[in-house]
Structure formats: structure tokens, C-alpha cells
Curated annotation (Swiss-Prot):
Its EC number is 7.1.1.-. Belongs to the complex I 20 kDa subunit family. NDH-1 is composed of 14 different subunits. Subunits NuoB, C, D, E, F, and G constitute the peripheral sector of the complex. It is a peripheral membrane protein. This is NADH-quinone oxidoreductase subunit B 2. NDH-1 shuttles electrons from NADH, via FMN and iron-sulfur (Fe-S) centers, to quinones in the respiratory chain. Couples the redox reaction to proton translocation (for every two electrons transferred, four hydrogen ions are translocated across the cytoplasmic membrane), and thus conserves the redox energy in a proton gradient. The gene is nuoB2. Its cofactor is [4Fe-4S] cluster. SUPFAM superfamilies: HydA/Nqo6-like. GO terms for biological process: aerobic respiration; electron transport coupled proton transport. It is found in: Cell inner membrane.
Length: 158
């Protein structure tokens, strides 16, 4: 039975988990945490060419209004406490996307004394987007992967 049969009867059945996860995937509000050149690609992805609004992705300036953090660029030791503080201010459920080689593992500056070798040492990361810098298409693919991950979550305890 296709959608036509469902619309004739006027009844759609689903589980509460699927309904909640569908709503969450359609309204991701990322907090921009741009630290270096990857932030330029993140801004490029938010522009009109890629139109992330069609996925329900609206960039928010405040951690209290967002549920996704995109860490884009080189994370240094001085910035690590600020990253953790912003992450703690986000409400549950929250997700983190690590964008670029520097955020993933230190990148080109891996052996520098002041660079954190991956933001996953400070906050739990859900999606890694590789590249130096990753393209806007790669970030868009990472957001789609995050939406797929959210769809597989169980919200209601069984």
C-alpha cells in the first residue's frame, strides 16, 4: 500500500520514537564554532548555493538555542575550556560535528605544543568530516549522516 492508501483512510501509524526523531532531523540548529580556515567553508555551506535551510539547518548564535555544534578548525589549548563550556551550555540532546583535519586530530599543526590533537579529547564527537579544509559538500554530507544517526536513536525507554 502506497501513500495514496494511507491518505484515503486518513490514518498514519508510527511509533513515538520515529516521530520524535523525524522532528529532530528536520530541525537541526547548529552553533558555529569556527576556529580557522574550515569556518570559511562552513559559511560557504550556509550560503544560498547549498541552501542548508531545506534540511532544516538554521545556524544559531547561542549555545542555548542550538543542538548541534560544528567545531571547524584548529583547537588550541587556550580555547579548549571555552569549547567545553559552550558544549555544557547546550541543552540535551546535543551532537557534535568535527570538521577538518585540525579538529579531527590536530592536522598540519599536530606536533605543536599548543594544539589539542582532536576535539574529541574535550567533547564527545558524533560525526567526523575529513579534509583540509573539507568542502561545503563534505559538511553537507556530514549533516546528512548526522540525520541518519539521529533516526536510529531510541528516545523512549523500553
Amino acid at each position: 500500500m502506497g501513500i495514496e492508501g494511507v491518505l484515503e483512510r486518513g490514518v498514519v501509524t508510527t511509533t513515538a520514537d520515529k516521530l520524535i526523531n523525524w522532528a529532530r532531523t528536520g530541525s537541526l540548529w547548529p552553533m558555529t564554532f569556527g576556529l580557522a580556515c574550515c569556518a570559511v567553508e562552513m559559511m560557504h555551506a550556509g550560503a544560498s548555493r547549498y541552501d542548508m535551510d531545506r534540511f532544516g539547518v538554521i545556524f544559531r548564535p547561542s549555545p542555548r538555542q542550538s543542538d548541534v555544534m560544528i567545531v571547524a578548525g584548529t583547537l588550541v589549548n587556550k580555547m579548549a575550556p571555552a569549547l567545553r563550556k559552550v558544549y555544557d551550555q547546550m541543552s540535551e540532546p546535543r551532537w557534535v560535528i568535527s570538521m577538518g583535519s585540525c579538529a579531527n586530530g590536530g592536522g598540519y599543526y599536530h606536533y605543536s605544543y599548543s594544539v589539542v590533537r582532536g576535539c574529541d579529547r574535550i567533547v564527545p564527537v558524533d560525526i567526523y568530516v575529513p579534509g583540509c579544509p573539507p568542502t561545503a559538500e563534505a559538511l553537507l554530507y556530514g549533516i546528512i549522516q548526522l540525520q541518519n544517526k539521529i533516526k536510529r536513536n531510541y528516545t523512549i525507554a523500553r
